[in-house]
Design a protein with these regions (language model features):
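Conserved ABC ATPase "signature" region
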Residues: 36, 50-69
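ABC ATPase nucleotide-binding domains
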Residues: 159-193
Length: 193
């Protein structure tokens, strides 16, 4: 009949947390409703949420430090608080793979460290694919790295050598000081990449 029907088991394969979720912050939706919207792909647009689904949303919000904001308007939250809520939204349907696009871009450094700790815990039960330009920071938290700059460079480890960095066509130096990695970029020479 030309219709592609996915089994229910494939509908929740992915969860997605964007770099910045753009929305009208005056839109009258509360934190719980945002988290529950992560179930829309399996429920459809016009079905109401069950008590068990609401409880799962509240449990996730409690787990990630947002329990006190369950009924707060989403537009009243800080950047870090919104990322927690959108993370709950991304995982409420129990995906097998979580895709993150620059998830710490708009958060402060205190929350950034906490966020990576949350991801480490989540990574015990699901796979995580993260896009980041902050190679120096994520090296401490990831198992493998795939770098893309004109071509794909896959590293089956979180360790990258100076020789490997040269192949990225962009001068990068990594310095690690204890558990706090740093990234220093040299200035590009004119006419060179």
């Amino acid at each position: 009949s030309g219709e592609v029907i996915y089994p229910v088991s494939r509908q929740n394969l992915f969860g997605y947390l964007p770099q910045n979720s753009r929305f009208d912050q005056r839109f009258p939706i509360d934190v719980t409703e945002v988290v529950l919207s992560g179930l829309m792909s399996e429920k459809g647009l016009y079905k109401s949420y069950t008590r068990a689904e609401k409880q799962k949303a509240w449990d996730l919000l409690d787990q990630y430090g947002m329990g006190a904001y369950k009924k707060a308007p989403i537009g009243d939250l800080s950047g870090g608080q919104m990322q927690r809520v959108f993370l709950c939204r991304a995982i409420i349907a129990s995906p097998r793979i979580l895709i993150l696009d620059e998830p710490t871009t708009y958060v402060d450094s205190n929350f950034e460290k906490e966020f990576y700790t949350i991801l480490e815990e989540l990574n015990k039960s699901l796979s995580i694919v993260m896009v980041s330009h902050d190679l120096g920071t994520i090296c401490s938290y990831v198992k493998t790295i795939a770098c893309v700059n004109r071509e794909l460079h896959y590293h089956n480890s979180n360790l990258i050598s100076a020789e490997q960095l040269q192949s990225y066509h962009c001068p990068i130096e990594l310095i690690t000081h204890g558990k706090i990695p740093h990234r220093v970029l040299k200035e590009h020479e004119k006419g060179k990449q």
